[in-house]
Amino acid sequence: MRKKISIIGAGFVGSTTAHWLAAKELGDIVLLDFVEGVPQGKALDLYEASPIEGFDVRVTGTNNYADTANSDVIVVTSGAPRKPGMSREDLIKVNADITRACISQAAPLSPNAVIIMVNNPLDAMTYLAAEVSGFPKERVIGQAGVLDAARYRTFIAMEAGVSVEDVQAMLMGGHGDEMVPLPRFSTISGIPVSEFIAPDRLAQIVERTRKGGGEIVNLLKTGSAYYAPAAATAQMVEAVLKDKKRVMPVAAYLTGQYGLNDIYFGVPVILGAGGVEKILELPLNEEEMALLNASAKAVRATLDTLKSL
């Protein structure tokens, strides 16, 4: 029996995620949105590409949550877009209501699903989704670190003049300007990145990574990134559905790891069929821990705002 993936939100990120997933033939796809005609039109358009691109999965669009029943993975991309000059925290009031509505309707219909959150502020919305769904925390995760690490790897490859395929990089922390790229855990085909890039340039790359989402928002003027976020989301879905045991940074629920409790936070995990199968604790130095704690403080402040609504 084919796997089933439901994507809630048929905007740029949602529909592009559907395209990546269809191309990978990971399962039948349901694209849901509250705007009548939009998910149906995008799903039909994508399905009509299947004879050309050669993927054999069904893609359907709907406004009815009943059509998402018995999903193996639920991806939530619904949310207000981020505008120039707007912080992720500005989005919290609007997107909290959207998240509650989506999860309260979708989760009961797919009690065994893994939920992947993609809306902002990411860490707080993932916490809210876990609370509303009542699912085990390991089956509710947030997509942030895979995207942020991809940006980091891209910038390293550009600077070093090497293939992006050979760059491995890790980062941690909240999804936002306080994320913590980790040059000490970044390599090019196993060679420390410091052998290729001078410390001052590496520091600039770290800062560009932190501002990566905002850079694209400022360039586009009327929207935000969607190709890379969708590709990152599809990679996480693939890790779950194929039980790949991928090591990747995701927003996971912490119960004492890194000295943090009752918070969704970007950390390296082993991702498989059960969602987060293990949280990996890296031996961070004093400077890295200070940055991590500062990031956690920012995430906690957003979470406190959420809880006060």
Curated annotation (Swiss-Prot):
Record's catalysed reaction(s): (S)-malate + NAD(+) = oxaloacetate + NADH + H(+)
Chain segments annotated as transmembrane: none
This protein's UniProt keywords: NAD, Oxidoreductase, Tricarboxylic acid cycle
Gene Ontology terms: biological process: carboxylic acid metabolic process; tricarboxylic acid cycle
Gene Ontology CC: one annotated term: cytoplasm
Purpose of the protein: Catalyzes the reversible oxidation of malate to oxaloacetate.
Protein family according to the UniProt entry: Belongs to the LDH/MDH superfamily. MDH type 3 family.
Protein name: Malate dehydrogenase
Species for this entry: Chloroflexus aurantiacus (strain ATCC 29366 / DSM 635 / J-10-fl)
Gene behind the chain: mdh
